[in-house]
C-alpha cells in the first residue's frame, strides 16, 4: 500500500476523535489536560497489563479460553482504574468548587462536568487506538498490504482500524455513563459500563473463527451504537433535570 493508505487507516481509527477534539475539547484548556492525563493513564495501564501477561505468552491460537481470561482480567483491572480515576476527578471537582466559592465565582456547571467525563473517555479511547491499532500501522505505509486467513476478505490494517473506531466510541461515551452513575449512585449505570466493556472485549474473540470478523465487527458496532444511544438519553435527561431545577429555583 502507500502512505495515503496508511494515513487513511489512521483516520478511520482516530478521525472522529480528532473532530471531537477540535470542535469541543480544544476550546477549554482543562479539557485538553484531562484528555492528555487520561490517555497517559490508560496507556500505562495497558503496558502494566502487557507486563503481567508477558510470562504466559505466546498463547495458543487454537485455544480460546486463555484469551477470554485475558479479556476478563484486563476489563476488571481497567474498570477498577476507571473508578479510581473518577475518585481523583471528584476530589479535584470539590477543590475547584471550594475555590470558586471563596472568590465568589460560579461552580462547575453540569455541562462542564459532562465535558470532563467526555474528555476522560476520549483519552481512554485514544489510548486503546494507539496501543491496538496505530502501533500496528507502520507496515501499512509500505508497498503491500496484509491479510489474515481468518478474515481474508478485508486487509488486516483496515479491520484493525475499524475495530479501534468501535472501541474509541465505546470508551468515550461509556466514561460519561460511568461518571454520572458514580456521581448519582445509579447502580444500573455503574453495572452497565463494565458489562459493555466486557461484552465488547469478548466479541473480539469471534474473530478467531473462520471469517469471524463478518459477524464480530457488526456486533461490536451494535454495542457501540447502544452505548452511544444510552449515553445520549442519559445526558438529555440530566440536562432537562438541571433546567427544571434552575427554573424552580428562580
From Swiss-Prot:
It is a multi-pass membrane protein. Keywords: Membrane, Notch signaling pathway, Transmembrane, Transmembrane helix. It comes from the Eukaryota. InterPro entries: Aph-1 (IPR009294). The chain crosses the membrane at residues 5-25, 29-49, 57-77, 116-136, 157-177, 191-211, 212-232. One of its GO terms (cellular component) is membrane. One of its GO terms (biological process) is protein processing. Its main location: membrane. The keyword Membrane applies. It is found in: Membrane. Probable component of the gamma-secretase complex, a complex composed of a presenilin homodimer, nicastrin, APH1 and PEN2. Probable subunit of the gamma-secretase complex, an endoprotease complex that catalyzes the intramembrane cleavage of integral proteins such as Notch receptors. Belongs to the APH-1 family. This is Gamma-secretase subunit APH1-like. It comes from Arabidopsis thaliana.
